[in-house]
C-alpha cells in the first residue's frame, strides 16, 4: 500500500524508473530527506558565498593591498589540495549526518570568531587569512559529504532532476550570497556582518539534524587503509566516462577561465565602467540559472554524455567569440552562453557521478571531483594571467578556445561510449567505452 504522504523516502520507490519521462521541475522535493538537504544546502552555500565576499572586502579594507587579496585566495586554495582526499574519506567512513553537523558548527564558530575580533577592534589581516583557510578546510569536508547524500534520498529516475535542483542552489547562492554580503556591509559594521553570516548556519544545522539517512548495507562497508584512502582516484581510473568528463572540465574550464580577465576586458576593450563590469561578472550566473531551469523543465536526459560534449564544445566556441568581441552587449550575451554551457555540463557530470559511483565510495569520489573542479579555477587563473601578459587577454582566451575545441572533438571521435552514455538503460554499456 502506497503512503498517503506526498513526502516519501527514496527507498519507497527505488524501482519507479518509468516516472523519469514526465518529472515535474520540483519532483525530487517530494522526498522528505532530499527536501531537507536541499534547504540546508541553500543556507550553507549562501553563507559560504557571503563569507567569501566579506573576507575579501575586509582584507582590502584592512590592508589596501592587492597582494594581500592574492594571499586570501591562496589561503582558500591550499586546503583544497592538502586535505581534499581526507575530507572525502571521512565522508565514507564517518556518520555523514554527524560530519555535516560538525562542519556546519565549525563554520558558525569561524564566522562568530571573526565577528567578535572585528567588533572588539582586535582583528588583523592574518586572522582573516586563518579564518579563510579554516573555512576552506571545513567546506572541503562538508561539500563532498553533502553531494554524496543526494542519491541516497531519490531513486535513479530522479537523479538528473535532483542534481539540477542542487545546481540551482549553487547558482542562486552566487547571486544571493554576495548581494547579502554587500547589503550587510553597507547597513552594519563588518563585525556585525560576520555575525549575521553566522546566523545562516542555524537553519542549515536544523535541516541536517532532521535527516534520516538509510544505513549502508554491511556488504558495502570497508575498513580504512591507504588503499581505501585512494579509492576515489582508483574509481576514476576504472570508469572512463567519469574520468573523461572530469579531465575535460579541468582542462577546458582551466585554460578557458575568463573571470580573472574580465576587469581588463571591461576597462580596456569594451570601455565600460564599474556598472558594466558588474553586469559582465553577473552574466554567467544568469546563463547558469537558465541552464538549470531548462534541465528542471525537461527532466531526465537520455543522452547525458552527448549533452556534456555539446556543452564543452559550446563553451570553447563561446569563449573564442567573446575574445574577439568588441561590443558590450554581444559580450554580455556570450558570457551568458558560457554560463549556460558550463551549467549543463556540470549537471551532466554530477549526474554521471551519482549513476556510476557506489555509495561506499561516493564521498571519496566527490572529493576528487571537487579537487579537479575547484582546482581548475586556481590553475586556470594562473595560466590565463600568464598568457595574457605574454600575448594579451584576447589571445589568452583564444588559446583556451583552441585547446578546448580540439580536446572536445578528439574525445567525441575517439570515445563513442561517452557519446552513448545516458540513462540507466545505457549506463552499463558505456562504462567499458
Per-segment meaning from a language model:
Residues 2-6, 72, 82-86, 93, ...:
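C-terminal transmembrane bundle of multi-pass solute transporters/carriers
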Amino acid at each position: 500500500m502506497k503512503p498517503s504522504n506526498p513526502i516519501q523516502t527514496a527507498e519507497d520507490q527505488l524501482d519507479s524508473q518509468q516516472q523519469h519521462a514526465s518529472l515535474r521541475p520540483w519532483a525530487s522535493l517530494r522526498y522528505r530527506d532530499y527536501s531537507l538537504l536541499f534547504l540546508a544546502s541553500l543556507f550553507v552555500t549562501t553563507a559560504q558565498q557571503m563569507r567569501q565576499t566579506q573576507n575579501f572586502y575586509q582584507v582590502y579594507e584592512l590592508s589596501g593591498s592587492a597582494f594581500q587579496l592574492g594571499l586570501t585566495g591562496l589561503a582558500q586554495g591550499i586546503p583544497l589540495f592538502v586535505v581534499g582526499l581526507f575530507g572525502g574519506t571521512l565522508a565514507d567512513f564517518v556518520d555523514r549526518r554527524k560530519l555535516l553537523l560538525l562542519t556546519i558548527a565549525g563554520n558558525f564558530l569561524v564566522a562568530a570568531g571573526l565577528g567578535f575580533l572585528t567588533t572588539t577592534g582586535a582583528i588583523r589581516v592574518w586572522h582573516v587569512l586563518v579564518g579563510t583557510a579554516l573555512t576552506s578546510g571545513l567546506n572541503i569536508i562538508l561539500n563532498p559529504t553533502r553531494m554524496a547524500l543526494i542519491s541516497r534520498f531519490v531513486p535513479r529516475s530522479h537523479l538528473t532532476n535532483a542534481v539540477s535542483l542542487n545546481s540551482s542552489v549553487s547558482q542562486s547562492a552566487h547571486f544571493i550570497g554576495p548581494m547579502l554580503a554587500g547589503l550587510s556591509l553597507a547597513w552594519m559594521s563588518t563585525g556585525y556582518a560576520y555575525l549575521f553570516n553566522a546566523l545562516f548556519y542555524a537553519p542549515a544545522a536544523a535541516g541536517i539534524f532532521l535527516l534520516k539517512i538509510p544505513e549502508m548495507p554491511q556488504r558495502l562497508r570497508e575498513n580504512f587503509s591507504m588503499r581505501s584512502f585512494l579509492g576515489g582516484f582508483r574509481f576514476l581510473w576504472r570508469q572512463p566516462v567519469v574520468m573523461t568528463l572530469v579531465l575535460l572540465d579541468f582542462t577546458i574550464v582551466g585554460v578557458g577561465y575568463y573571470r580573472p580577465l574580465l576587469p581588463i576586458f571591461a576597462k580596456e576593450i569594451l570601455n565600460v565602467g564599474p556598472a558594466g563590469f558588474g553586469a559582465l561578472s553577473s552574466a554567467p550566473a544568469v546563463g547558469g540559472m537558465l541552464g538549470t531551469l531548462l534541465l528542471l523543465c525537461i527532466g531526465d536526459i537520455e543522452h547525458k554524455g552527448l549533452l556534456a560534449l555539446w556543452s564543452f564544445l559550446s563553451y570553447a566556441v563561446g569563449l573564442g567569440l567573446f575574445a574577439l568581441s568588441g561590443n558590450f552587449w554581444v559580450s554580455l550575451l556570450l558570457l551568458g552562453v558560457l554560463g549556460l554551457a558550463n551549467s549543463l555540463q556540470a549537471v551532466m557530470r554530477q549526474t554521471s557521478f551519482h549513476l556510476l559511483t557506489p555509495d561506499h565510495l561516493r564521498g571519496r569520489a566527490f572529493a576528487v571531483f571537487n579537487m579537479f573542479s575547484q582546482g581548475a579555477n586556481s590553475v586556470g587563473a594562473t595560466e590565463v594571467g600568464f598568457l595574457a601578459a605574454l600575448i594579451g587577454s584576447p589571445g589568452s582566451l583564444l588559446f583556451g578556445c583552441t585547446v578546448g575545441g580540439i580536446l572536445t572533438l578528439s574525445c567525441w571521435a575517439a570515445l563513442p561510449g561517452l557519446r552513448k552514455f545516458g540513462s540507466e538503460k545505457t549506463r552499463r554499456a558505456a562504462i567499458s567505452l
